């Protein structure tokens, strides 16, 4: 793959967000350009926002330490900087659904690690090795949301691709 997609992590300071950050470091398909979290973390560098709560077994990547964390509720600002987001927020399910739909309606695709949309009929839960065809429901979701590009897809986990594995859609 020649192009790297610009991606953001929404909920970047929490445990799952930290995991996304470590997995996206030096990823062949994705360039982590944007980190977003709650208003408490907004405006701080990632290193300041996470502080001693860094929970990963590997050190915080140098490439993100000085990145300024954006306010995840400022959807248009975050969405304008990325091709899509990975969502790992920790909030009540109704708030997660509203936030993820706001990003999708801002024409920003959402790959969610949250359970809030797992039973929404037109939101695919995709485990690529098992059910990649579930993305076929996305046009129906786009119609419901009134979007051309934005959508929500839920995944149960995120890992680096095996060497030589091709990205398919």
Predicted segments, located by residue:
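N-terminal Rossmann-like NAD(P) cofactor-binding subdomain of oxidoreductases
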Residues: 1-169
């Amino acid at each position: 793959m020649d192009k790297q997609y610009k991606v953001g992590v929404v909920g970047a300071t929490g445990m799952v967000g930290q995991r996304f950050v470590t997995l996206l470091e030096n990823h062949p398909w994705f360039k982590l350009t944007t980190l977003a979290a709650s208003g408490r973390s907004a405006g701080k560098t990632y290193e300041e926002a996470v502080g001693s709560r860094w929970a990963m077994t590997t050190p915080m990547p140098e490439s993100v330490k000085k990145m300024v964390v954006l306010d995840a509720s400022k959807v248009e600002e975050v969405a304008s900087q990325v091709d899509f987001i990975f969502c790992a927020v920790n909030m009540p399910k109704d708030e997660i659904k509203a936030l993820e739909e706001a990003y999708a309606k801002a024409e920003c695709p959402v790959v969610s690690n949250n359970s809030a949309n797992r039973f929404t009929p037109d939101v695919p839960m995709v485990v690529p090795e098992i059910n990649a065809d579930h993305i076929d429901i996305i046009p129906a979701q786009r119609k419901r949301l009134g979007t051309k590009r934005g959508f929500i897809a839920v995944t149960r986990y995120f890992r680096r691709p095996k060497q030589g594995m091709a990205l398919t859609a």
